[in-house]
Amino acid sequence: MKRAVVVFSGGQDSTTCLIQALQQYDEVHCITFDYGQRHRAEIDVARELAIQLGAKAHKVLDVGMLNELAVSSLTRDNIPVPSYSEEGEDSIPSTFVPGRNILFLTLAAIYAYQVQAQAVITGVCETDFSGYPDCRDEFVKALNHAIDLGIGRDIAFITPLMWLDKAETWALADYYQQLDRIRHDTLTCYNGIQGDGCGQCAACHLRAKGLEFYLANKPKVILSLKQKTGLV
């Protein structure tokens, strides 16, 4: 039986990954992390979506120690979330949570070991991202190798969105006839607003810009998606 664990935040990217995984695996488990994040409403959104979409199980882990160690505008109320216009192109933004994906992927791999899953799926992306170093393909592959050595089992880290831009990610949701669900029911906003979000933070800006481009250029974006992914 093919099993996978999806690192699931209830946002656009991880929900799109879950939708695809449910088509590709016999059994899909979700794992969500509560680290005292500013946009903590995402946890309830993730719970509801996991039920609606039909995940086999959904585990929510308390990793509050990350909040204690990692100083970020997503973990500290006294550090404001910058608007997309305030973020510098060449610097790591204040929304970066140091060590987050190191911890999340490690714990997801342990969970995968427990449920005998062959894959851990994460929605990180290097094409359209906010400059987070732990979203890079190089990082994911390096950590995957280290974890395989450390647990003595091959668990593949799968990154379906790694080389897709946001418009292509919208196209992928549309391919599975889930664009409206992704738009209205997910929570990507750093300020914790479901759907189209606050419209001001970098996450909302990237998401809205991608949707606008996709809706205006559907045939072109769908063709690009199929060329990159092999979907027919």
Swiss-Prot record:
Pathway: Purine metabolism; 7-cyano-7-deazaguanine biosynthesis. The keyword Ribosomal protein does not apply. Keywords: ATP-binding, Ligase, Metal-binding, Nucleotide-binding, Queuosine biosynthesis, Zinc. Zn(2+) binds at residues 189, 198, 201, 204. It holds the Pfam family QueC. It comes from the Bacteria. ATP binds at residues 8-18. Binds 1 zinc ion per subunit. Gene3D superfamilies: HUPs. Its cofactor is Zn(2+). PANTHER family: 7-CYANO-7-DEAZAGUANINE SYNTHASE. NCBIfam families: 7-cyano-7-deazaguanine synthase QueC, PRK11106.1. Catalyzes the ATP-dependent conversion of 7-carboxy-7-deazaguanine (CDG) to 7-cyano-7-deazaguanine (preQ(0)). This is 7-cyano-7-deazaguanine synthase.
